[in-house]
């Protein structure tokens, strides 16, 4: 496999044996300690791993954090990206020709403003966008367009609890987790160094799960 900075970084992580995927959203965001929260976050993390180890794999669901402004939702996704330059929250308009510049080189991309203003029309647009496994575009100075398999996943954050126009075809794309900052053990920015170390261990745990499954397709199955 060709050198990939995210893959190489992930492979260097050593898990200390402490379970964190189940508790991180409770700890920093005040989410419930439930099987649903655990399964949704684990699913999203497995999609993110598969997208860098197997670019272009199907990954059309979006983890959405729902809760009060100032709770640290965007910071959560930034820390989850491990390095700030692997994160982007610059995706504003899916119809913009520069949308691919917002995707390229990033691993986790937050779509906060679009989720907050979601409508039936934009819901269809977002579903279509999420379902793509590759993007075709021409970079600056290139002569021809080129297919590029996606290596990123998309996340959402909103302050609005009624943000999804539930319909038979699209609601499953959005996986909401409710947050309550008043129930968080600590704010995610109280100790950034500690939080970033916690997220490194979060991915170290995820890598153990990833390598334990020979059939990688099983990683995306909800077990409960």
Language-model regions: role of each:
Residues 2, 58, 85-89, 95-122, ...:
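Feature primarily recognizes SF3-like P-loop helicase cores of small DNA viruses
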Residues 77, 126-127:
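Short amphipathic alpha-helical segments and helix-helix/interface helices
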Residues 2-104:
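P-loop NTPase catalytic core of nucleic-acid-dependent motor ATPases
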């Amino acid at each position: 496999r060709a050198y990939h900075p995210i893959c190489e970084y992930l492979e260097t992580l050593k898990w200390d044996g402490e379970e964190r995927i189940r508790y991180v959203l409770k700890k920093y965001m005040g989410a419930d300690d439930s099987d649903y929260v655990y399964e949704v976050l684990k699913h999203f993390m497995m999609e993110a791993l598969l997208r860098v180890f197997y670019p272009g794999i199907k990954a059309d669901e979006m983890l959405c954090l729902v809760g009060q402004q100032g709770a640290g939702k965007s910071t959560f996704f930034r820390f989850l990206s491990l390095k700030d330059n692997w994160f982007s929250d610059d995706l504003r308009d899916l119809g913009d020709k520069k949308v691919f510049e917002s995707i390229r080189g990033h691993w986790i991309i937050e779509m906060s403003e679009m989720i907050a203003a979601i409508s039936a029309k934009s819901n269809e647009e977002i579903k279509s966008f999420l379902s793509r496994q590759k993007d075709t575009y021409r970079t600056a100075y290139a002569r021809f367009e080129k297919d590029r398999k996606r290596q990123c996943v998309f996340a959402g954050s909103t302050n609005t609890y009624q943000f999804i126009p539930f319909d038979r075809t699209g609601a499953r794309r959005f996986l909401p987790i409710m947050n309550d900052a008043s129930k968080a053990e600590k704010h995610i920015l109280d100790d950034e160094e500690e939080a970033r170390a916690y997220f490194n261990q979060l991915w170290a745990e995820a890598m153990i799960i990833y390598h334990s499954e020979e059939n990688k397709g099983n990683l995306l199955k909800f077990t409960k």
